[in-house]
Amino acid sequence: MTAEERSSALHVMVIGSGWHFTSGISHYTYRLSTALAGRCAASALLMRRLVPRRMYPGASRVGADLTNVGYPVHVPVYDGVDWYWGRSMTQALTFIDRERPDVVILQWWTGAVLHTYLRLARYAARRGAKVILEWHEGQDVGEATMPGTRQYVGTLMPRLLRYVGAHVVHSGFDLHNLTAAYQLGDAPVRVIPHGPYDHLARPAPARPASPDEPLRLLYLGVVRPFKGVEDLVAAFSTLDRAQAIRFRLMIVGETWEGWTEPDEAIARSPHADLIERVDRYVTDAELAGYFGQADAAVFPYHRSSASGPLQIAMSAGLPVVVTAVGGLVEATRDYQGADPVPPRDPAALGSALLRLLGRRGDRYADPHSWDRTVDSFCSLIDELRGRTPSAAARQHAAMGVDRR
């Protein structure tokens, strides 16, 4: 897009997480921004110092260079706003004035950004921008257990909602939770599926079945109470030795909230020698390596709205065993490689692990597409701006749910 074309095009600004506190939302913010940039002028305004470092569960790796992706030159970026504002907020407002977005899309996942989003949304809305709030979950579950945080979000969120013209969620599960939690008035709420994390993993070539090699199972993600990793270890431990020796289990991810039960379960497992544990947040290059080694991925969550690692596994085309909870049911509904199991059920999980032996080397097409995701966003944006959506946008928007 030339400078002249960019000046006359629809301009969408995505506001979300930056790389200083790298997370799945950092990658989503990046990927949505770059996908939108293929259709319109797009920019990104990032949160930099998300919270005081001492308060962050992954404090030891804050600021580390963990990613190998960067925003392209045609996507202007401000990186970014600090939790305590200072000059960073003044510069963010200047960035909004310079870019003059027609639409801003706020990525919501934590109450830590609420005071900042309230300021940015009010500023952008008063300058004529339409505001879309994209909900990844109502509030981080660990954060919600901290004294006063649930009340803080519940008190200030209605103020933010005054400036929001439309909402986006990733599943009917999230739609139900959102409409039960807040009065949204007549603002449209669109279900738009999570786009693929195809910048982190590519479809892996099918491997020929080799019964002499162990099947490599991968759990990758932060280890927290709701992730259910201890259930995976329990399921693996219930296999007899002849069964277990046919696998290698890789558990990769840093521990949050002091949740050591999975590591304790590994230590007492009769198959501990078959389990590799990597207790840190790995780089993008390492992540690609683990998914490249894996024959299958396992996600034993107790609850979840969405899962970045699950999206990566589907982008890689791997067989996945995933618990049928929350938004994961819809995320995997059209993925032929998914084997859903009930949560908190190591016996069912163990049976699913054994079924993977018959799917060794299989690869599957990821049903998710950024083209469809962007079509749905464009349809919603046209609606907010009082324009008629394109035929493609209307078609893909109709695949979701619109609640008014």
Describe the function of each predicted region.
Residues 16-22, 34-98, 254-258:
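N-terminal strand-loop element at the rim of the active site
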Residues 122, 126, 139, 149-167:
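Membrane-proximal helix-turn-helix segments that form the acceptor-binding/catalytic region
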Residues 161-189, 196-198:
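A short, active-site helix/loop in glycosyltransferases that binds the activated sugar's phosphate group
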Residues 179-180, 190-214, 387-388:
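Acidic anion/phosphate-binding donor-loop and adjacent secondary structure
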Residues 209-227, 233-236, 250:
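Conserved donor-binding/catalytic core segment of Leloir-type glycosyltransferases
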Residues 262-285:
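Nucleotide-activated donor-binding/catalytic signature segment of Leloir-type glycosyltransferases, i.e.
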Residues 289-305, 318:
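Acidic donor-binding loop of glycosyltransferase active sites
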Residues 334-347, 354-358:
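Conserved acidic donor-binding segment of nucleotide-sugar-dependent glycosyltransferases
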